[in-house]
Amino acid sequence: MKIINILFCLFLLMLNGCNSNDNDTLKNNAQQTKSRRKRDLTQKEVTQEKPKSKEELLREKLNDDQKTQLDWLKTALTDAGEFDKFLENNEDKIKSALDHIKSELDKCNGKENGDVQKNTFKQVVQGALKGGIDGFGASNATTTCNGS
């Protein structure tokens, strides 16, 4: 019986020694796994960045008034691909068109039928831009509001 007790104690000591090494190994593996996950997440974030659209790139270069007019123009150009075609133009031409739209819409602010006239101007802009941005301006895209 003494021999069995001694062997049992030795077995427990050996088992305890193996567990302590395994615990350290498990901790190291857990830390390595965490660092791998962090590395994988940062790599996914880098690859998930989408290239910016033409509209986003243009918005970075516009002032606040021009951004507002771009939003307005986006609602005016409702046909498929019309707004995208507009964005393909030269940046300076787009900016001057947006400034012209702002100046025309400002004429309608505070007027009695301003909202109706702005909606009419939307249709005018839509028709004027069908011919391209080169002819767009005071000659073919004006509001019916009287400037004061």
Swiss-Prot record:
Q: Where is the lipid attached (S-diacylglycerol cysteine)?
A: C18
Q: Name one Pfam family in it.
A: Mlp
- Where is this protein localized, as stated in its record? Cell outer membrane
At the top level of its lineage, which domain of life is listed?
A: Bacteria
CC terms in the record's Gene Ontology section: cell outer membrane
Residues carrying the lipid (N-palmitoyl cysteine) are C18
Q: Which UniProt keywords are given for this protein, alphabetically ordered?
A: Cell outer membrane, Lipoprotein, Membrane, Palmitate, Plasmid, Signal
Entries under InterPro entries matching the protein:
Mlp
Q: What induces it?
A: Induced when grown at 35 degrees Celsius.
Q: Where is the signal peptide?
A: 1-17
Where would one find coiled-coil regions in this protein? none
Describe the family membership recorded for this protein in Swiss-Prot or TrEMBL: Belongs to the Multicopy lipoprotein (Mlp) family.
Task of the protein: An outer membrane protein that may participate in pathogenesis. Some human Lyme disease patients have antibodies against this protein. The Mlp proteins probably undergo intragenic recombination, generating new alleles.
Q: What name does the UniProt record give this protein?
A: Lipoprotein MlpH
Species source reads Borreliella burgdorferi (strain ATCC 35210 / DSM 4680 / CIP 102532 / B31) (Borrelia burgdorferi)
Per the UniProt record, the lineage of the source organism begins with:
Bacteria, Pseudomonadati, Spirochaetota, Spirochaetia, Spirochaetales
